[in-house]
């Protein structure tokens, strides 16, 4: 099983030093996208990620986050301005692809579906996590300096968007639960049912409880 965390920070420029269109935090959680693909182990496709050591199949979970930060700047002189963050929009996405060899047992398929279920479970509360993180940035005031205040403003908001998505990625902690699931099932090599292993792993390491 492999989880990917991708972050993109976007910036929308409006009139001079005024970047907010509507105040507040907006979280846009897109529906999860699922796909199942088969492959020939002797000739795996180029776009298939390498399987996790110990497994012949793969569940590839890609958590995407995109933060757009807006603020209002009050220029105090030619080279100084105070920026107040007044708008944050975070878009979340989860893409899951299960890769299985052409000849695979139902037990292995169920194991990979268990990985998918864990990712889906974490994604259920991902909007709440993103909301909490973004709320900490709302209302922040930062002084920018330089001869190109618009450029400084652009860099500030891009960095803040990147900081939000980085924090979201770090706080998800889904990988630790997935690793526990693999330990419980011995990478599908024992007879523990996937549904039982999923329940045990989520009970032992639920969202928000994993260690840093």
Where are these regions (language model features)?
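Bacterial N-terminal signal peptides that target proteins for export
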Residues: 1-8
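N-terminal signal peptide c-region/cleavage motif recognized by signal peptidases
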Residues: 14-15
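Signal peptide processing junction and immediate N-terminal pro/mature segment
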Residues: 18-19
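Metalloprotease/metallohydrolase-associated module, dominated by Zn2+-dependent proteases
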Residues: 22-86, 90-92, 137-212
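Alpha-helical segments in soluble extracytoplasmic regions
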Residues: 85-101, 132
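Active-site alpha-helix of zinc metalloproteases
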Residues: 103-107, 116
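Catalytic Zn2+-binding segment of zinc metalloproteases
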Residues: 113-131
């Amino acid at each position: 099983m492999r989880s990917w965390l991708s972050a993109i920070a976007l910036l929308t420029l409006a009139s001079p030093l005024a970047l907010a269109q509507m105040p507040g935090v907006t979280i846009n959680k897109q529906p999860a996208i699922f796909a199942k693909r088969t492959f020939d182990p002797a000739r795996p496709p180029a776009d298939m990620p390498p399987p996790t050591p110990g497994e012949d199949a793969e569940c590839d979970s890609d958590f995407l986050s995109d933060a757009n930060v807006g603020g209002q700047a009050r220029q105090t002189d030619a080279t100084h301005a105070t920026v107040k963050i007044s708008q944050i929009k975070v878009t979340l996405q989860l893409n899951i692809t299960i890769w299985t060899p052409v000849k695979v047992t139902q037990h292995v398929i169920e194991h990979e579906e268990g990985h998918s279920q864990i990712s889906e479970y974490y994604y259920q509360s991902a909007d709440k996590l993103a909301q909490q993180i973004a709320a900490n940035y709302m209302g922040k005031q930062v002084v920018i300096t330089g001869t190109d205040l618009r450029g400084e403003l652009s860099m500030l908001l891009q960095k803040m968007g990147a900081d939000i998505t980085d924090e979201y990625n770090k706080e998800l902690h889904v990988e630790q639960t997935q690793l526990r699931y693999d330990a419980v099932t011995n990478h599908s090599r024992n007879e523990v049912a996937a549904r039982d292993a999923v329940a045990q792993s989520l009970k032992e390491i639920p969202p928000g409880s994993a260690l840093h």
